[in-house]
Amino acid sequence: MALCCLASAQVKTDKSCPPPTDWAGLNVFGSDDAEIRPPSPNEQRVVLLGDDVMANATFHNRSYINRGIAGQTTPQMLVRFRQDVIALNPKVVVIEGGLNDIGGVAGPGTEGTITENLASMMDLAKAHDIRVVIASLSPVCDCVTNQTGRRSVGRIAAINHGLQDFARQTGAVYLNYYTPLVEARTRQMKKEFTNDGFLPNAAGYAVITPLVEKAVAQALAAKAPEGQLK
C-alpha cells in the first residue's frame, strides 16, 4: 500500500495512506467511524467516498463526512463501503473513483471493473435506503509531469460517458465536474485548476465543491428510486 500511496499524485498523512497490511484502508477511518453518533432525526447526513480527489476536498457542512483515501481504487472502496458508509447511516453517498483504477495503482483496472464495483456499491446503498451520487472522473494534465500516459484523455472521457449512462439507468444522480475543469481542445485539465496535473488546486476545488453540494441537494429532492424508502 505504500507503493499505492506513492503512485498517487499526492502523499498525505496517515489519514490517507493505509499501512501495508490494510489493503482496503479499513483502519484509516475505523476508529473515527466508531465514535460518530447516529444522525439526528432531521439531519441530512452525507458520506463522501473516494480517492485522492475526494480526500483533498473540504466541506464546511457538518453533515458531510469525508471518507476519501488517497491512492484508492474502486475495489478497495467496495470493501470498506459497509464500514465507512452504511454504518454511518447517511441519506446520501457521493461515490468518486476510477482514476487510480486506470492508473494501475492497485493492479489492472478496466472500465468494466469500475462499473461492476460501482454497481455493487449501488446495490448495497439501495438495500440500506441510501441515495447515490456518482461522480465523474476529473481530467488530468501533462502540464507538470506525464499524467496522460497511464490515464489517457480518451479513456477518461469514455469512462465518464459510461458513468453517466450507469447513473441514468440506476436512478443515481450524475455529478459532472469533468466538463468545467477540462480544456475542450486538448481534453486535459485546465492549467489554472491544477498544480501537479492530477489533483485540482484551490481554484479547482472552488469549482468542484458547489457542484457536489448541488448534486447532493438534487439527490435529496428527487423521488426515491424503486426499492428506496427515503
PLM feature spans:
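N-terminal secretory targeting modules
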Residues: 1-47, 55, 59, 87-88, ...
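Conserved beta-strand elements of the Class I
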Residues: 47-49, 65
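Glycine-rich beta-strand-to-loop/alpha-helix junction loops that act as flexible
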Residues: 49-50, 70, 97-99
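Pocket-edge structural micro-motifs
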Residues: 50-51, 202
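Short glycine-enriched loops at secondary-structure junctions
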Residues: 51-54, 179-181
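Short substrate-entry loop that stabilizes the transition state in hydrolases
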Residues: 56, 73-74, 104
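Alpha-helical cap/lid subdomain in secreted, periplasmic
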Residues: 61-63, 78-230
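A short beta-strand-loop structural module common to alpha/beta enzyme folds
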Residues: 63-76
